[in-house]
């Protein structure tokens, strides 16, 4: 009987000591390059369709399924951080600056590109909520991918980007797991690449300076405040590359801050109590004035054409308007500039 108990005890101790414990080890590289070396990417877009994102898919990326070896119930998630300056945003995602002309959209996450988190700001953020391995050995990976963004209005050009540090991903143990002295952070640098950027736009066919002769009228034709009479008309014509949608902004040259629909008369005008409004085509609502800028979404910008028109034109009607301050006859002069945006 004594020998039986000794054998039983020995077997019990052997089984006990084979129970696994949560463990992690680093098997990746601390410094990693994103994208192919000397990559080259080409695209065509309208001049003012900015910011313009190059659809490179996942070609500019880094993906590694074997960065940490984990076992025995170890629980791990991932945090990511971008070190580049934020220069704008697109649909809630930060645009990070590389050069004056080129920026980046960045995604970080686990091994699967499609689950990457769109990065915003420069703080650590959760890019993979995590999981707990069972009583077996597995690995935790990660991925980073980017898309270049054209930031500024320019003619067709080639942009070269040098190798640039992007940021980092760190392993985040949780649920009682501990990394101890194991390497938890890996860094990423974007490999150099070239963008071959082709832009499309339009050419103005009518003179850049248009003089509209205003008809002479009597004060009796504008008896009440808000009354209008057609004073003159003109047309603007363009020749456009295929696919370009033209937008335009009128700016009050005398009072550039004017955002109303009444053009300020110049100092050379002698009439008072009268203003000028500008209408396009058959619209019943006058155009409002905005900043002298081709930026997409400029204040009081209006659509002149669709992307299917290669020879767009617009008819503009200038109307006198009684401003309600009492009309005194005289000369009427106004200056408005027009700025086109090719989107």
Swiss-Prot record:
Residues 200-343 are annotated as: Fimbrillin-binding domain. Transmembrane segments: none annotated. A carbohydrate binds at residues 65-66, 110-111, 138-141. GO terms for cellular component: pilus. This is F17f-G fimbrial adhesin. The keyword Signal applies. Residues 23-199 are annotated as: Receptor-binding lectin domain. Residues 1-22 form the signal peptide. Residues 287-307 are annotated as: Disordered. It comes from Escherichia coli. GO terms for biological process: adhesion of symbiont to host; cell adhesion involved in single-species biofilm formation. One of its GO terms (molecular function) is carbohydrate binding. InterPro entries: Adhesion_dom_fimbrial (IPR000259), Adhesion_dom_fimbrial_sf (IPR036937), Adhesion_dom_sf (IPR008966), Bact_Fimbrial_Adh_Pro (IPR050263), Fimbrial_adhesin_lectin_dom (IPR015303). The lineage of its organism: Bacteria, Pseudomonadati, Pseudomonadota, Gammaproteobacteria, Enterobacterales. The gene is f17fG.
């Amino acid at each position: 009987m004594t020998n039986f108990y000794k054998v039983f005890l020995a077997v019990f101790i052997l089984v006990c000591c084979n129970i696994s414990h949560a463990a992690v080890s680093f098997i990746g590289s601390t410094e990693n390059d994103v994208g192919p070396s000397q990559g080259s990417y080409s695209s065509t877009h309208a001049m003012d369709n900015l910011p313009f994102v190059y659809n490179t898919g996942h070609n500019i990326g880094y993906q590694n399924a074997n960065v940490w070896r984990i076992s025995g119930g170890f629980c791990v998630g991932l945090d990511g951080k971008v070190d580049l300056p934020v220069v704008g945003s697109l649909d809630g995602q930060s645009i990070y600056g590389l050069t004056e002309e080129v920026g980046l959209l960045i995604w970080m996450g686990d091994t699967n590109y499609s689950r990457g988190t769109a990065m915003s700001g420069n703080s650590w953020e959760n890019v993979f909520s995590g999981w707990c391995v069972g009583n077996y050995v597995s690995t935790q990976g990660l991925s980073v991918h980017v898309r270049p963004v054209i930031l500024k209005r320019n003619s067709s050009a080639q942009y070269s980007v040098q190798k640039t540090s992007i940021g980092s991903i760190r392993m985040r143990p949780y649920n009682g797991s501990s990394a101890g002295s194991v390497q938890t952070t890996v860094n990423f640098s974007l490999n150099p690449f070239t963008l071959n950027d082709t832009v499309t736009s339009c050419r103005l066919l009518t003179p850049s300076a248009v003089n509209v002769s205003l008809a002479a009228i009597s004060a009796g034709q504008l008896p009440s405040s808000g009354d209008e009479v057609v004073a003159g008309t003109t047309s603007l014509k363009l020749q456009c590359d295929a696919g370009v949608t033209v937008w335009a902004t009128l700016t009050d040259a005398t009072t550039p801050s004017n955002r109303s629909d009444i053009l300020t008369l110049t100092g050379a005008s002698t009439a008072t109590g009268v203003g000028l409004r500008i209408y396009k085509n058959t619209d019943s609502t006058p155009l409002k004035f905005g900043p002298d800028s081709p930026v997409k979404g400029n204040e009081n910008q209006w659509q002149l054409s669709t992307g299917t028109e290669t020879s767009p034109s617009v008819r503009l009607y200038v109307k006198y308007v009684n401003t309600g301050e009492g009309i005194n006859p005289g000369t009427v002069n106004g200056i408005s500039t027009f700025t086109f945006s090719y989107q």
